[in-house]
Amino acid sequence: MSFQSRLGCRWVRFYVKRKPPGEAALVEFTRRRFRTPGWLVWYHSLGAKIERIERPVKGEWVSSRRHSRADGVIYYLHGGGYISGSAKSCRPITVTLARHSGARVFALDYRLAPEHHFPAGLDDTAAGYRWLLANGIDPRSIAVAGDSAGGGMTLALALQLREANEPLPGCLVCLSPWTDMTSGSDSLRENSARDSMFVAEDIERYASAYLGDHSRRDPLASPLLANLQGLPPILIQVGREEVLLDDARNLHANVHAAGGSSVLHIYEDVPHGWHYGAPFVPETGEALREAANFIRTRIQT
Protein backbone atom coordinates (compact mmCIF):
# COMPACT_ATOMS: atom_id res chain seq x y z
CA MET A 1 0.00 0.00 0.00
CA SER A 2 1.33 3.40 -0.92
CA PHE A 3 1.52 6.16 1.68
CA GLN A 4 -1.06 8.11 -0.31
CA SER A 5 -3.52 5.20 -0.33
CA ARG A 6 -3.03 4.60 3.40
CA LEU A 7 -3.70 8.27 4.09
CA GLY A 8 -6.74 8.17 1.81
CA CYS A 9 -8.19 5.15 3.62
CA ARG A 10 -7.84 6.88 6.98
CA TRP A 11 -9.31 10.14 5.72
CA VAL A 12 -12.30 8.40 4.10
CA ARG A 13 -12.96 6.33 7.24
CA PHE A 14 -12.89 9.43 9.44
CA TYR A 15 -14.84 11.70 7.10
CA VAL A 16 -17.59 9.57 5.54
CA LYS A 17 -17.93 6.13 7.16
CA ARG A 18 -20.28 7.15 9.98
CA LYS A 19 -23.52 8.35 8.40
CA PRO A 20 -26.57 9.95 10.04
CA PRO A 21 -29.95 8.17 10.40
CA GLY A 22 -32.89 9.05 8.18
CA GLU A 23 -33.12 9.32 4.39
CA ALA A 24 -33.11 13.11 4.19
CA ALA A 25 -30.05 13.33 6.43
CA LEU A 26 -28.30 10.59 4.45
CA VAL A 27 -28.90 12.44 1.18
CA GLU A 28 -27.65 15.75 2.58
CA PHE A 29 -24.61 14.08 4.16
CA THR A 30 -23.70 12.18 0.99
CA ARG A 31 -24.05 15.18 -1.29
CA ARG A 32 -21.97 17.34 1.02
CA ARG A 33 -19.24 14.86 1.96
CA PHE A 34 -18.88 13.20 -1.45
CA ARG A 35 -18.58 16.51 -3.30
CA THR A 36 -15.24 16.77 -5.11
CA PRO A 37 -13.36 19.83 -3.73
CA GLY A 38 -13.43 22.83 -6.04
CA TRP A 39 -9.64 23.13 -6.10
CA LEU A 40 -9.38 19.53 -7.30
CA VAL A 41 -11.93 20.11 -10.06
CA TRP A 42 -9.97 23.23 -11.08
CA TYR A 43 -6.68 21.33 -10.98
CA HIS A 44 -7.99 18.62 -13.28
CA SER A 45 -9.35 21.21 -15.69
CA LEU A 46 -5.79 22.33 -16.43
CA GLY A 47 -4.63 20.81 -19.69
CA ALA A 48 -8.17 19.71 -20.53
CA LYS A 49 -10.87 21.14 -22.75
CA ILE A 50 -14.28 21.19 -21.06
CA GLU A 51 -17.48 21.86 -23.02
CA ARG A 52 -20.76 22.02 -21.12
CA ILE A 53 -23.91 20.59 -22.76
CA GLU A 54 -27.37 21.52 -21.46
CA ARG A 55 -29.75 20.09 -24.08
CA PRO A 56 -31.08 17.73 -25.23
CA VAL A 57 -29.03 15.94 -22.56
CA LYS A 58 -26.99 17.37 -19.69
CA GLY A 59 -23.31 16.72 -19.18
CA GLU A 60 -19.88 17.77 -20.32
CA TRP A 61 -17.38 16.87 -23.00
CA VAL A 62 -13.87 16.36 -21.67
CA SER A 63 -10.81 16.04 -23.88
CA SER A 64 -7.08 16.34 -23.44
CA ARG A 65 -5.56 19.39 -25.12
CA ARG A 66 -2.38 17.45 -25.90
CA HIS A 67 -3.49 13.88 -26.58
CA SER A 68 -7.01 14.08 -28.01
CA ARG A 69 -8.17 12.35 -31.15
CA ALA A 70 -11.50 12.72 -32.85
CA ASP A 71 -12.68 9.11 -33.08
CA GLY A 72 -13.03 7.20 -29.79
CA VAL A 73 -15.57 8.26 -27.14
CA ILE A 74 -15.88 7.23 -23.50
CA TYR A 75 -19.42 7.66 -22.21
CA TYR A 76 -18.94 8.11 -18.45
CA LEU A 77 -21.53 7.58 -15.70
CA HIS A 78 -20.55 8.97 -12.29
CA GLY A 79 -20.98 7.25 -8.95
CA GLY A 80 -22.58 8.56 -5.78
CA GLY A 81 -25.07 5.93 -4.64
CA TYR A 82 -27.60 7.20 -7.21
CA ILE A 83 -28.27 10.16 -4.88
CA SER A 84 -25.20 12.35 -5.42
CA GLY A 85 -22.40 13.13 -7.85
CA SER A 86 -22.22 14.90 -11.18
CA ALA A 87 -20.26 15.17 -14.40
CA LYS A 88 -18.17 17.84 -12.70
CA SER A 89 -17.48 15.79 -9.57
CA CYS A 90 -16.04 12.89 -11.57
CA ARG A 91 -13.61 15.12 -13.46
CA PRO A 92 -10.56 13.56 -11.72
CA ILE A 93 -11.51 10.34 -13.52
CA THR A 94 -12.73 11.72 -16.83
CA VAL A 95 -9.77 14.02 -17.41
CA THR A 96 -7.33 11.24 -16.55
CA LEU A 97 -9.07 8.77 -18.86
CA ALA A 98 -9.09 11.32 -21.67
CA ARG A 99 -5.37 11.93 -21.24
CA HIS A 100 -4.37 8.26 -21.09
CA SER A 101 -6.73 7.00 -23.81
CA GLY A 102 -6.71 9.93 -26.23
CA ALA A 103 -10.49 9.55 -26.49
CA ARG A 104 -13.06 12.24 -25.86
CA VAL A 105 -15.16 11.67 -22.75
CA PHE A 106 -18.80 12.60 -22.38
CA ALA A 107 -19.80 12.60 -18.70
CA LEU A 108 -23.56 12.58 -18.16
CA ASP A 109 -25.57 14.42 -15.54
CA TYR A 110 -28.47 12.04 -14.90
CA ARG A 111 -31.38 12.65 -12.55
CA LEU A 112 -30.72 11.67 -8.94
CA ALA A 113 -32.80 9.94 -6.29
CA PRO A 114 -34.72 10.36 -4.08
CA GLU A 115 -36.20 13.27 -6.04
CA HIS A 116 -36.25 10.98 -9.08
CA HIS A 117 -36.60 7.27 -8.34
CA PHE A 118 -35.59 4.42 -10.63
CA PRO A 119 -35.73 4.28 -13.63
CA ALA A 120 -35.36 8.04 -14.19
CA GLY A 121 -31.55 8.03 -14.07
CA LEU A 122 -31.37 5.00 -16.34
CA ASP A 123 -33.76 6.65 -18.80
CA ASP A 124 -31.42 9.65 -18.91
CA THR A 125 -28.47 7.34 -19.47
CA ALA A 126 -30.17 5.67 -22.42
CA ALA A 127 -31.13 9.07 -23.85
CA GLY A 128 -27.51 10.20 -23.60
CA TYR A 129 -26.25 7.14 -25.44
CA ARG A 130 -28.81 7.58 -28.21
CA TRP A 131 -27.83 11.23 -28.47
CA LEU A 132 -24.24 10.19 -29.12
CA LEU A 133 -25.40 7.87 -31.90
CA ALA A 134 -27.65 10.58 -33.35
CA ASN A 135 -24.57 12.79 -33.61
CA GLY A 136 -22.93 10.28 -35.91
CA ILE A 137 -20.72 8.43 -33.43
CA ASP A 138 -20.20 4.78 -34.32
CA PRO A 139 -21.34 2.63 -31.38
CA ARG A 140 -18.30 0.39 -31.88
CA SER A 141 -16.10 3.41 -31.09
CA ILE A 142 -17.86 4.02 -27.75
CA ALA A 143 -16.76 2.66 -24.38
CA VAL A 144 -19.33 2.99 -21.60
CA ALA A 145 -17.71 3.35 -18.19
CA GLY A 146 -18.78 4.18 -14.66
CA ASP A 147 -17.83 3.91 -11.01
CA SER A 148 -19.87 2.46 -8.13
CA ALA A 149 -23.53 3.24 -8.92
CA GLY A 150 -22.37 4.38 -12.35
CA GLY A 151 -20.76 0.97 -12.84
CA GLY A 152 -24.08 -0.71 -12.17
CA MET A 153 -25.82 1.70 -14.52
CA THR A 154 -23.21 0.92 -17.19
CA LEU A 155 -24.34 -2.70 -17.12
CA ALA A 156 -28.02 -1.79 -16.95
CA LEU A 157 -27.65 0.38 -20.04
CA ALA A 158 -26.01 -2.46 -21.97
CA LEU A 159 -28.80 -4.84 -20.93
CA GLN A 160 -31.46 -2.35 -21.97
CA LEU A 161 -29.82 -1.82 -25.36
CA ARG A 162 -29.47 -5.56 -25.91
CA GLU A 163 -33.14 -6.21 -25.13
CA ALA A 164 -34.21 -3.42 -27.48
CA ASN A 165 -31.93 -4.74 -30.27
CA GLU A 166 -30.11 -1.40 -30.33
CA PRO A 167 -26.40 -1.10 -31.20
CA LEU A 168 -24.11 -2.03 -28.33
CA PRO A 169 -20.94 -0.13 -27.42
CA GLY A 170 -17.48 -1.51 -28.08
CA CYS A 171 -16.73 -2.29 -24.43
CA LEU A 172 -17.72 -1.64 -20.83
CA VAL A 173 -15.59 -0.52 -17.88
CA CYS A 174 -16.98 -1.03 -14.37
CA LEU A 175 -15.03 0.54 -11.50
CA SER A 176 -16.11 -0.92 -8.12
CA PRO A 177 -19.56 -1.53 -9.61
CA TRP A 178 -22.71 -1.83 -7.51
CA THR A 179 -24.50 -4.65 -9.31
CA ASP A 180 -26.78 -6.27 -6.70
CA MET A 181 -29.37 -4.36 -4.65
CA THR A 182 -30.69 -7.43 -2.82
CA SER A 183 -27.93 -7.13 -0.18
CA GLY A 184 -27.24 -10.85 -0.37
CA SER A 185 -23.47 -10.99 -0.88
CA ASP A 186 -21.01 -12.34 1.67
CA SER A 187 -18.64 -9.39 1.27
CA LEU A 188 -21.32 -6.95 2.50
CA ARG A 189 -21.03 -8.54 5.93
CA GLU A 190 -17.42 -9.73 5.87
CA ASN A 191 -15.97 -6.39 4.72
CA SER A 192 -18.19 -4.01 6.68
CA ALA A 193 -15.47 -3.39 9.25
CA ARG A 194 -12.63 -3.26 6.71
CA ASP A 195 -14.28 -1.04 4.08
CA SER A 196 -13.20 2.55 4.71
CA MET A 197 -16.42 4.09 3.38
CA PHE A 198 -19.41 1.78 3.84
CA VAL A 199 -21.06 -0.76 6.10
CA ALA A 200 -23.71 -3.19 4.88
CA GLU A 201 -26.53 -1.00 6.20
CA ASP A 202 -25.39 1.90 4.02
CA ILE A 203 -25.91 -0.13 0.85
CA GLU A 204 -29.40 -1.02 2.04
CA ARG A 205 -30.24 2.63 2.66
CA TYR A 206 -28.93 3.84 -0.70
CA ALA A 207 -30.93 1.11 -2.45
CA SER A 208 -34.12 2.24 -0.70
CA ALA A 209 -33.50 5.86 -1.64
CA TYR A 210 -32.95 4.91 -5.29
CA LEU A 211 -35.69 2.34 -5.78
CA GLY A 212 -38.46 3.43 -3.44
CA ASP A 213 -41.03 0.61 -3.59
CA HIS A 214 -39.64 -0.89 -6.79
CA SER A 215 -38.39 -4.49 -6.73
CA ARG A 216 -34.71 -4.85 -5.95
CA ARG A 217 -34.62 -7.95 -8.15
CA ASP A 218 -35.36 -6.01 -11.33
CA PRO A 219 -32.35 -6.85 -13.53
CA LEU A 220 -32.06 -3.22 -14.60
CA ALA A 221 -31.61 -2.29 -10.94
CA SER A 222 -29.56 -5.39 -10.02
CA PRO A 223 -27.83 -6.36 -13.28
CA LEU A 224 -25.99 -9.18 -11.50
CA LEU A 225 -29.32 -11.05 -11.57
CA ALA A 226 -29.78 -10.60 -15.33
CA ASN A 227 -29.02 -12.87 -18.25
CA LEU A 228 -25.58 -11.54 -19.18
CA GLN A 229 -25.27 -13.15 -22.60
CA GLY A 230 -24.25 -11.05 -25.57
CA LEU A 231 -22.63 -8.14 -23.73
CA PRO A 232 -19.50 -6.33 -24.94
CA PRO A 233 -16.13 -7.12 -23.32
CA ILE A 234 -15.98 -5.86 -19.73
CA LEU A 235 -13.17 -4.64 -17.49
CA ILE A 236 -13.98 -4.80 -13.77
CA GLN A 237 -11.86 -3.23 -11.03
CA VAL A 238 -12.52 -3.45 -7.29
CA GLY A 239 -10.68 -3.20 -3.98
CA ARG A 240 -10.32 -6.37 -1.91
CA GLU A 241 -11.62 -4.68 1.24
CA GLU A 242 -14.74 -3.17 -0.33
CA VAL A 243 -18.22 -4.28 0.68
CA LEU A 244 -18.90 -4.39 -3.08
CA LEU A 245 -16.16 -6.98 -3.67
CA ASP A 246 -18.65 -9.77 -4.38
CA ASP A 247 -20.68 -7.51 -6.69
CA ALA A 248 -17.56 -7.42 -8.86
CA ARG A 249 -16.40 -11.02 -8.42
CA ASN A 250 -19.85 -12.48 -9.04
CA LEU A 251 -20.32 -10.27 -12.09
CA HIS A 252 -17.04 -11.55 -13.53
CA ALA A 253 -18.06 -15.17 -12.89
CA ASN A 254 -21.55 -14.71 -14.33
CA VAL A 255 -20.25 -13.05 -17.49
CA HIS A 256 -17.90 -15.97 -18.10
CA ALA A 257 -20.67 -18.48 -17.34
CA ALA A 258 -22.77 -16.73 -20.00
CA GLY A 259 -19.97 -17.10 -22.56
CA GLY A 260 -18.84 -13.49 -22.41
CA SER A 261 -15.49 -11.75 -22.04
CA SER A 262 -14.53 -10.18 -18.72
CA VAL A 263 -11.30 -9.07 -17.06
CA LEU A 264 -11.29 -8.70 -13.27
CA HIS A 265 -8.54 -6.86 -11.36
CA ILE A 266 -8.74 -6.85 -7.56
CA TYR A 267 -6.61 -4.10 -6.05
CA GLU A 268 -5.12 -4.43 -2.59
CA ASP A 269 -5.41 -1.88 0.22
CA VAL A 270 -7.46 0.77 -1.56
CA PRO A 271 -10.69 2.45 -0.39
CA HIS A 272 -13.91 2.54 -2.34
CA GLY A 273 -13.67 5.55 -4.64
CA TRP A 274 -9.89 5.34 -5.00
CA HIS A 275 -10.33 6.12 -8.70
CA TYR A 276 -10.91 9.75 -7.67
CA GLY A 277 -7.37 10.02 -6.28
CA ALA A 278 -5.62 11.01 -9.51
CA PRO A 279 -2.89 12.16 -9.77
CA PHE A 280 -1.89 11.87 -6.12
CA VAL A 281 -2.50 8.15 -5.40
CA PRO A 282 -0.25 5.72 -7.35
CA GLU A 283 -2.92 3.00 -7.29
CA THR A 284 -5.33 5.41 -8.97
CA GLY A 285 -2.92 6.06 -11.81
CA GLU A 286 -2.36 2.33 -12.27
CA ALA A 287 -6.09 1.59 -12.37
CA LEU A 288 -7.00 4.36 -14.80
CA ARG A 289 -4.10 3.54 -17.11
CA GLU A 290 -5.32 -0.05 -17.17
CA ALA A 291 -8.83 1.16 -18.01
CA ALA A 292 -7.54 3.45 -20.76
CA ASN A 293 -5.45 0.65 -22.29
CA PHE A 294 -8.44 -1.71 -22.19
CA ILE A 295 -10.57 0.88 -23.97
CA ARG A 296 -7.96 1.66 -26.62
CA THR A 297 -7.63 -1.98 -27.63
CA ARG A 298 -11.35 -2.70 -27.79
CA ILE A 299 -13.10 0.23 -29.43
CA GLN A 300 -12.97 0.65 -33.18
CA THR A 301 -11.39 3.88 -34.35
Language model segments and positions:
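A glycine/proline-hinged amphipathic helix-loop "lid/cap" segment
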Residues: M1-H67, Q300-T301
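Alpha/beta-hydrolase superfamily serine-hydrolase fold, recognizing
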Residues: I50-T301
